[in-house]
Amino acid sequence: MKKYWIWLPVALALSGPLLAKDWHVSPKGDDANSGATPAQPFRTLQKAESVVQPGDTVLLGGGIYASAPDADKSHNSALLKVRTSGRADAWITWKARKGEKPELHSRQWSAIEINGSYHVFDGITVTGQNDEVVLLKAIEASKKTVKDAFYNTNGIFIEGRNNPPESKPHHIIVRNCVVSKMPGGGIVAIEADYVTVEDNKVFENAWFMEYGGSGITFLNNWAFDDKPGYHIVVQRNMSWNNKTMVAWEKIGKLSDGNGILLDVSDQDEGGATNPNADASVTQGATNPNGDPVVKQEKKEARPKRPIWRNRALIANNLSAFNGGSGIHTFRTSHVDIINNTTYWNGAVVGYEELFPNRSNDIVILNNIIVPRPGGKVTSNNRNTRITWDYNVYPVDQTIWKGPNDIVADPKFIDPYRDLLRADFRLAKGSVALGSGGGSLPQAVDLAGRKRPTGKGRDRGAYEQ
């Protein structure tokens, strides 16, 4: 008996990992199945969410997972709504079954909405209905009191606003996903912490929403703790042709449609941009153009966010042909923007390529920044503690000048509009080859290639 009680705590401690399960889902499955084997898959992702436990893996079989015709389309509805949380030692993983391509088609407010913590989403394709939308009808819908999810569907949405302050979503990884053609935002995180968005392709999103969305957006980061290290990581993503074509209802004109945006981590309650129209704003600047608010909404008392002291990394991304900026921060602090390539952004709303706006402690190094014809490299509006150096841009500018900047054509191999076909690697003889700085070194480039490969580091998203 004595030996039994010695070993029982050990058995209990190991029971979590040992009992972790694989759950199987397929569009050809049945929610009455056990879900325990590939031969007995569930049909819906929501059924899997109802049984998943910390440490479990949900394996998505190939095919299309679509919203049912009678699906709930009220605010905060989603094809998959993730409320369950994993643990620090037992994350929950949602991933494509090896060799298969699961694709989500949602007509609700999001394809995936994540309210829980400790989740990994890996290798999932989310495709929206942009090809079906008529712009005039989207504009008409934006003027109605009752909002229609069809014109505002987000892709992958980490949503913390409805969680109590002590349980905001945190420790979320979105990787190897393809998010495209969403009428709303592509990958969005609001009131969350410890979020990594990496190795994704995000394109043709935010076209028809009325809330000023973008390809990849973080808004109102909510600190889980103040431990050192990066809390927000956006790396090795391709983000292109995200834009807005319907006026943002708060200002009555087009706004945002950026490739990558880190938005509002300060404590000021006024002037927040908002990809989903819930955060109230006050009169004042709401975007890089300084457009005033023309529509006010009643504001409910909300808990005050913890002061954001943590650091974010935006690195090795390619952001091109977006209607807003390639990359920018707005009312945000403590961000490292390293080894990115931006190209021909801002054609819809006129934003600059890459810039901080009303931000503090932003480090911008080793980037290649190529504005569209007539466009601008960067701007400076009420910023403090900006570090800018080792950047390459083809047209001179006087906003920020690093001693190691180079003004020259970086010589891309093939800067085609479809990034699935383009080649933004550097041609032989490029001034960006081997001339980068060594501060904040990145281990790999956009393609996963080791940095550096030679004597010096390359600038931009690719190492050669």
Language model region names:
Residues P27-G62, A66-S67, L79, W109, ...:
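Acidic Gly/Asp/Thr-rich repetitive segments characteristic of extracellular carbohydrate-active
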Residues V52-E103, E113-T125, A432:
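Beta-solenoid repeat scaffold
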Residues A66-A68, K73-L80, R107-H231, Q235-R236, ...:
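Right-handed parallel beta-helix
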Residues A68, P102, R107, I124-N130, ...:
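Surface-exposed loop/turn segments connecting beta-strands in extracellular beta-rich domains
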Residues A71-L79, D89, P288, N310-D423:
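Predominantly extracellular beta-rich ligand-binding scaffolds that present long acidic/polar faces
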Residues S85-K95, E113-G123, D148, T153-I173, ...:
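Surface-exposed loop/turn motifs in large extracellular/passenger domains
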Residues R421-D423, S430-Q464:
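Surface beta-loop-beta hairpin patches that serve as ligand-binding interfaces in beta-rich domains
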